[in-house]
Amino acid sequence: MSYYNRYRNKRRSDNGGGNLSNSNNNNGGMPSGLSASDAIFDLGKNKRVTVRQFRNINLIDIREYYLDSSTGEMKPGKKGISLTEDLYDELLKHRLNIDEALRRLGSKRPKTKMVRLLSDDEYEDDNNNDSTNNDKDKNGKDKNSPKKRREDKSKASNESHDLEPRSKKKKPAPPTLLPHEENIQNAEREANATLIIPGQAGRKQQEERKQKEKEEAEEAKAKAVAEQEKEAKAKEKIAEPEPEPVPTLQAKKEDIVSNINESKDANSSDEEFAQSLEAEMNKAEDDISEEE
């Protein structure tokens, strides 16, 4: 047997067994005046809550414990969580939201207005003793101490939480999905998602370009056919013979021409008559002059 094992067995026998040594170990790191039974609480099966102090920081540990078969002692496991005082206060502040979320998940928890806690009584005492506290502060107590700031902050948050109307209160977070529900939702997302293959991107662009070129070619072909039809119709109109003039119009034209010719002939005969008459008058005058 090694020196270490002999020393450990001797210390265990001096302390009165493993339970006592376990209590001493659990009491290590705690402030004086606080026993292990006051700082350790059992939670269900193989779980404990330990209130301890580490580097002047108060911690609340929730850890799993297992039974060591070699020593018969309960030793802390790897699974657990540590909360500071601020986190613990925030957890208590949201206890109503947590209860509501649990009820939405199907829990049979009764719906109560408020759970009375020791901290609530302390806040009420602080509210009742505001005047005395102010006097003490005037007498020289430090208002900016961390403890005083923490108390004021918690008091203000509780007052605002109580005075806040129901409509403005934050709604509880939606319930977390169960594993099979999450799988169903993921399957729906994958089914509706668009599949993009890196190597197919260029091919898709080429297909779109070919489709566009094909549509443009069809449009140009349709335009050419329309122009050809238009030209053919124009040629047909040019090749058609002119309609023959109406006979009545031609007869009217001939009558007008004959009337013009007759008027011309009449004018010419009048001139000849005037000339002959003038010649006879001149001849008669000549004869008279000769006789004289």
UniProtKB/Swiss-Prot annotation:
Transmembrane segments: none annotated. It is found in: Nucleus. Residues 133-166, 179-191, 204-240, 251-267 have a biased composition (Basic and acidic residues). InterPro entries: PC4_C, ssDNA-bd_transcriptional_reg, Sub1/Tcp4-like. The keyword Transcription applies. Present with 7820 molecules/cell in log phase SD medium. Belongs to the transcriptional coactivator PC4 family. This is RNA polymerase II transcriptional coactivator SUB1.
